[in-house]
């Protein structure tokens, strides 16, 4: 306690008359880059929902940055100088367009729910400075924001927020709410960056038929004290945009200053199941097909392999001398990931699967080698197939899940990019129907869509269940098992093992080779150990798979 008080006194006296780097009260902190020296670079942006006069002109821009060793420690994103005029009383826009910032760099953190990091005091020597002072800005609408997680950013890395889109229309904005500098046991500097999301609309692209946009509008209406809307309003013409006003920029700072980003992709090691694959269940009822082409790899323990040749051209990967601390939540500093994209594509730990001779198991109790229920291609029979490995398995990871309320009174949850098979509720049942034909990311499922669901007790033709409501919930534990077919029944729902792309042949070949390569490397250097439940093959490789699926589409496999 005495140290904290002393630190605050020192910070106040040290920075009271010092110019620092800040976004000001009319732009939002949306990115944080860390140079190899440990110096943080704060990025500021002005989206269409913040920092504007109702006449379409910018509020005065009082962002300013500090130069350390000829390097500016912040920048302004190149945003429009003007937008369409708008009615300040319109319930779709925030009545408050400006934040209230502290006068000095006087805070050790910006933790309240209605604050973001408006500025970072100059760090003249990042390697020796342990205490960093911040200028916190308060903005009341942030009370309705959603926590997106914490990114761990080390030298040469960057975390980027910004606009979140649905159908190419912005509906939210990810911002930096808090930053904490830390030093690991090896003396390496890293920053823990809290990311939050608040509703943010472009009035020229408000389409209430898009669920995300409608939800965002209702959030803003609630913040402004207005009633919700539940239907698509008639489209009306907007006013002609006014001429652009002049951007007010401090002397020596250029709007849209470019920042060179060097990305270091650090991936966790993983281990493969060491026990031999169990035989298929005896006395299997009709409909079971022995998996083809799967050869269990026993007795190895690969770790630390980093696939080469798939790095985005914009980045120059460097050798990581010390492991980069893993980000403990949904954000990770990977430059090729879209803004706001979680890197977890999984089921929650409380999801249920039916295991042969084991009854229903929670997902966090499932193990490699278990035979789990799945529907055959046409959904006419329920069969059992083996779990080959884990794409993701992290019992302590906190993540956001899309939770569907179904018309049978049950719920079903998975992360927003994970695929689930969707059908139209009105289509007649048919033994010729391909139930794998329409895999859809959870974030794209709409109220009124139907899922395929297995009978609770009978091994016969699938049923359909309708989505009645959709919510975002936060749960602890992420699990993504890979079966020999690329799909399985989770909470009796026919779901894919994949995310982004449902190209099973491509992904299975890729991950099988990764396992083999890692196995050889691991066996050469380390002792074999058993690790049935700690495999995490997929971290960092989903982007590679998305590229491969573009090069080799699933239709050609």
Curated annotation (Swiss-Prot):
Keyword line: Autocatalytic cleavage, Cell membrane, Developmental protein, Hydrolase, Membrane, Protease, Secreted, Signal
Record PTM: The C-terminal domain displays an autoproteolysis activity.
Signal peptide location: 1-20
Positions of the record's site feature: Essential for auto-cleavage: 418
UniProt-listed InterPro entries: Dev_Signal_Hedgehog-like, Hedgehog, Hedgehog_Hint, Hint_dom_C, Hint_dom_N, Hint_dom_sf, Intein_N
SMART domains associated with the record: HintC (SM00305), HintN (SM00306)
Residues with site note (Involved in auto-cleavage): 415
Gene Ontology molecular function, alphabetical: peptidase activity
GO biological process: cell-cell signaling; intein-mediated protein splicing; nematode male tail mating organ morphogenesis; protein autoprocessing; segment polarity determination
Region of interest (Disordered), residue spans: 272-308
Pfam families xrefs: Hint (PF01079)
Record site feature (Cleavage), residues: 345-346
Function (record text): Intercellular signal essential for a variety of patterning events during development.
Protein name (record): Warthog protein 4
Organism per entry: Caenorhabditis elegans
